[in-house]
C-alpha cells in the first residue's frame, strides 16, 4: 500500500503514526489569497461557477500548507439551484433560496437528469484540479446530504432548529418524501459526474443530521446516505466515500457500516478516545479538532491536536476539524497544527 496516496491508505484501513491531514473549508475567507480571488470573481456564486478561479482557490491551501487532500471548492446548495430553485447570498447572513412548501413547489422542480447543464462548470473545475494537484494530493468531491439540503430548500435559508423542514416532514409527508427522493437522485448524478471528472474520493455532508431523532434519523439521514453510496459504489466499485452525519451522537455507532461508507467523519462533541473504542472498529475515522482552537492557536492547539492524533493512531484516521475552519482563524495557526501532528 506504500505506493498509494496517504489519504487513500487511511481510507483503505491502514493505521499510521502520522495521519493524513486536511481541513473542512480549507479554501476560505481566513486566507488573504482567497479573499483576493473572490473579489476578482465578483461574488461567491460567480466564484463557484468559474472553473479557473474555483480551481485556483482550491489549490491555494495546498500551495500554502501541503495538505494531504484537496476538496473541491463549491457549495452544497448548487444542487437546489440546478433543480430550479432561485439561490442568492446575502452578505453577512448567508444563503437564500426560493422555498418549497407544498406540491406546487415540487412541480416547478427539474428532474435529476436535468442538473448537468447548470453544474457543468463544477465538473470542469474537477478536471482542472485532477491535472494540477500535486501527485501525492488526493482530490475529494462532495455534496450535501438530502436532509440537510432539504432543510434549506424548505425554509429558504439556514435555520437553527430546522423547524420548517420538520413541519413539512410531519404535516405533508408525501411532498417531503418526493423532495427527498429528488435530492437523493440528483446527488447520485452530481457525485457520479465529479468522479468521472477526476474526484478520487467523495464526501457526503449531513450538517443537520443531529436534529433527526429515532426512526426519523434512520429514514431521512441513514437511508438516503445508504442509497447514494450503494449506487455510487455500483458505478465505481473502488470509490472511497466519507460520510459526515454531524451531531449524530449515539447514532454514529454503526453508521459507516450501515450506509456502506469507508470513513466516518465526526464532530467536536465526540471524544477521540471514545471514537477509537466505538467507531474505529468499523474503519476509518475523520476528525475532530474544535475549529475554535484554530483561532486560539499556541500550545492549546498543539496539545489538543497531539491528543486526538495519539488517541486515534491505533486505527485508520484522517486528521481534520469537527466543523469548518472559521474566517477569523489565523493562517499561522495551521502551521502550528501541522507541526504538532507531523512531528
Swiss-Prot record:
Q: Which GO CC annotations does the UniProt entry carry? A: cytosol
Which terms in the Gene Ontology molecular function aspect does this entry carry? Answer: uroporphyrinogen decarboxylase activity
Which Gene Ontology BP annotations are present?
protoporphyrinogen IX biosynthetic process from glutamate
Localization recorded for this chain is: Cytoplasm
Reactions catalysed according to its record? uroporphyrinogen III + 4 H(+) = coproporphyrinogen III + 4 CO2
**What's its EC?**
4.1.1.37
- Which pathway, per its entry? Porphyrin-containing compound metabolism; protoporphyrin-IX biosynthesis; coproporphyrinogen-III from 5-aminolevulinate: step 4/4
Q: Which family does it belong to?
A: Belongs to the uroporphyrinogen decarboxylase family.
Query: What does the record give as the function of this protein?
Result: Catalyzes the decarboxylation of four acetate groups of uroporphyrinogen-III to yield coproporphyrinogen-III.
Name of the protein? Uroporphyrinogen decarboxylase
Gene coding for it = hemE
